[in-house]
Amino acid sequence: MAVTQPPSNTISSSSTAFAQGEIEITNNCKVSITTPSKIVRPATQATQAYSVNFTITQNKSCADIGSRIAYWSEGSQSPFRMVNTSNSNIFYSFSNFSESPSTALLSGTGGKKYSLANKGVQIVNVTIPIPQSGVYIPGRYTLGLNAGLVIN
């Protein structure tokens, strides 16, 4: 802001003063991700398909100011990875997933892909299917998803 002329010529400009206060609006918007239920399935001959389901949520007030949910996988070039907790060299990549509502797929630093929801979206659901026909080395695995907010 700047000094402005008095609104009336009855106010002498030599008698005026100007001051301004400073206001800082901090970003308190954050996302949360639900922890998926644990899946227990046989290494071979699974009798059904399984899915890892994530729900990413931001506060309604953050969605209302235009904050957008972004999410990405742990994989170096975007596939979701199911990684053995005892030996990280054992992993399986999954490129197929579904989301609701649909998001835009964008390229970030180093070509890393991420998904960006529209403004106003408060919740994004992401489902990564673990194929029924897959054959996996027995062990404990994790499959991660990262999320954050874009405010612009």
Which ranges hold each PLM region?
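Short, solvent-exposed coil/turn linker segments
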Residues: 37-40, 93, 104-105
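Short linear motifs in low-complexity, proline-biased tails and propeptides
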Residues: 95-103, 136-142
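Generic N-terminal initiation segments characterized by hydrophobic and/or small/turn-forming residues
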Residues: 77-79, 91, 102-103
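Acidic surface patches and DE-rich sequence motifs
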Residues: 73-74, 84-85, 108
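Short, surface-exposed beta-strand/strand-loop-strand elements in extracellular ectodomains
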Residues: 82-98
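A signal for specific C-terminal beta-sheet/loop modules enriched in small/flexible residues
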Residues: 49-51, 93, 113-117
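N-terminal small/polar-rich segments of proteins
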Residues: 2-81, 121-152
